[in-house]
Structures are given as C-alpha cells and as structure tokens.
Design a protein with these regions (language model features):
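SAM-dependent transferase fold signal centered on methyltransferase-like domains
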Residues: 1-314
Length: 314
C-alpha cells in the first residue's frame, strides 16, 4: 500500500492519510516546505514518510506503472492573475492532462478542489470520475473531492456517486445523502399544493451537489414549486441535512395580508427562494428589522403565487 501526495504543501492532508499506508511519499516543489515536512514527519509518528522535492508533473513521469495504491493531488485554484477559478481546466497543475498518467501509476486518484468549482463540468471534462464528495460544516461547504479510477474511465465516468455530507462541530456526521446525476435527472418529487406544517431548507452540501429533486424523495418531502429549493411536510425529519422550521402562517402580498404580517412582527430573518426580488429591497418594502426569533421565506408556491412563509426554527 503506497500513498503518493503530489502537492504536499504544509503536509496537513498528507499527515492524516499517511498512517493508513505502509509507504507514503510527500512531493512538494518548494524546498522550504520540504525541509519543514522532513522535520515534522518524525514528530507526527510518520517515520515511513519519504520527502521528495520535485514538481508534481516531473515526479509523475518517474513513477512506474502501478507503483502507487493511491495518488492525492490538491491543485492551485487561482489563475495567473490571482483570480479564483471555477473550472477544473484552470487549475494548476492541469488535472485533465495529468489524469491518464496518474491512473497509470495508481488505480485510484483523489483530487481535492475548491468548492466553487463547477462539479458537472469537471465530471464531463475528466470522464473518469467514480465518486464526488462534498463536505459542509457550520453552514458552509468546506471540501470538494473527486475520486477518479481506472474502472470509471473504462465505463465513461460521467455518472458518479455524489455524496453530500454535513459534519457536526464534534466531528461526527450530521447527515449524508448519496445519489447519481442520473438519479436526479429521473426523480419526480411531489409538489405540495400548499405549504405544510414544517418547512425544510437544504444545507450547503446538498445545494452544491445539486440534489434538488433527490432530497425530496430521500426525506419523503414535497417541494413547494418545481424551481423552489424549499421542501415541506407534516412530519418532522430528525436527521434532515439542513435547517428545519415550523410554519406559523402564510401571507400573500395584498395590503391586508402585509398589514396582518406586520401586526405579528416587525422583525425577522428574511430569505428569498425562487422569488423576483432581493432581500434588501424586500426588507424595505416590508419595513422589517433584521433578526429575532422569526424567519420569513419569500418564495413561489406551486400555483405560481408569491408568498411569505412566517416560520420559527425547530
């Protein structure tokens, strides 16, 4: 079992993976980081770590076929001008160009990417992706990993297993959803005629994964509208990956309805979902202060009605 990390950097990822392998090679082009790694690895109880000062592309040419069990690579995600990239083609080193060589040296390659990257475009460009992992914590996507394999390459690699995971502060898994792009394309979730007792807002990992229809089927929920990524049900889902709210009232935009809303509260946390206005403009119109125990979702319902859902967190 041999791990090769082609972009060792500070060695954080390497130090977590290396104990799982009998051999572990850290590759880094910056001499200073290699010196730091050589000092730190014995202190981290990783005496088997081999430090190589080389460019990732250069070292890859020296790897014999099947000389590694797993290759890990974390390419730079900024362009020459310093702008963050959203396409895998813009990462350095060029993962698409290196993929055949990496898969020749190892049967499995794990690519760590920016959560800003376009997942579907990356899957199409590589054509050898078997798994996609999106990890969120504290309400924010933190990691995006692509697993590319020889087997996926032989099969076309364009319908990978996508797993969206929410990690809790204590390091445990707070929810996980696995599906394929084909599952999402074929899914036909029920659409609610009206909002029900509970409103469900999917977490960032699910949103990044694009599991908009699959989420409804997985948790036995109904969508509020085909293009509204909010869900509803009369039952409480304890392990829902996202935020859960109890619906207190539904208002439309008639004068009497808005007056009734303001008689209940003049302060709320406001969000828009599939709605033709920004939060700022809507807040001014509704004359609502920010914060408080109430949450209001401005959204579009199944019949096309624009509505305000007054909720409280569960």
């Amino acid at each position: 079992q041999h791990l090769v990390d082609l972009t060792g950097g500070l060695g954080v990822d390497f130090s977590f993976m290396a104990p799982l392998f009998a051999q572990a090679t850290y590759v880094e082009q910056q001499p200073q980081l290699c010196q730091l790694a050589a000092h730190n690895m014995p202190l981290l109880a990783l005496p088997h770590a081999r430090i190589v000062n080389a460019d990732a592309t250069q070292h890859l040419t020296q790897l014999a076929p099947d000389s590694a069990s797993l290759i890990f690579i974390d390419p730079a995600r900024r362009s020459a001008t310093g702008r963050k990239t959203v396409l895998i083609e813009d990462c350095q080193p060029d993962i698409i160009t290196l993929a055949p060589s990496m898969l020749k040296a190892a049967p499995v390659v794990v690519v760590k990417l920016s959560t800003m990257l376009d997942i579907a475009a990356a899957v199409r460009a590589l054509g050898c992706v078997s798994q996609v992992h999106i990890v969120a914590t504290a309400g924010e996507c933190k990691d995006l990993l692509l697993v590319i394999t020889r087997q996926a390459k032989a099969q076309g690699g364009t319908n990978p297993l996508i797993t969206a995971t929410n990690m809790l502060p204590d390091g445990t898994i707070g929810g996980s959803l696995t599906f394929t792009p084909q599952d999402e394309a074929n899914a036909t979730p029920p659409i609610a005629a009206q909002p029900l007792r509970y409103i469900y807002e999917p977490g960032p990992a699910i949103m990044k994964a694009g599991a908009f229809k699959t989420t409804a089927l997985h948790y036995q929920l109904q969508k509020l509208h085909t293009n509204t990524h909010l869900y509803t049900a009369d039952h409480l889902v304890p392990d829902f990956q996202g935020r859960t709210f109890e619906l207190k009232a539904t208002y439309t935009f008639g004068k009497a309805q808005l007056k009734a809303l303001r008689s209940v509260t003049t302060q709320a946390n406001l969000a828009v979902r599939n709605f033709p206005a920004s939060v700022d403009s809507l807040r001014k119109r509704l004359k609502l202060r920010d914060g408080g125990p109430y949450y209001i979702f401005a959204t579009t319902l199944a019949d096309g009605t624009h509505a305000l859902l007054l909720c409280e967190r569960v």
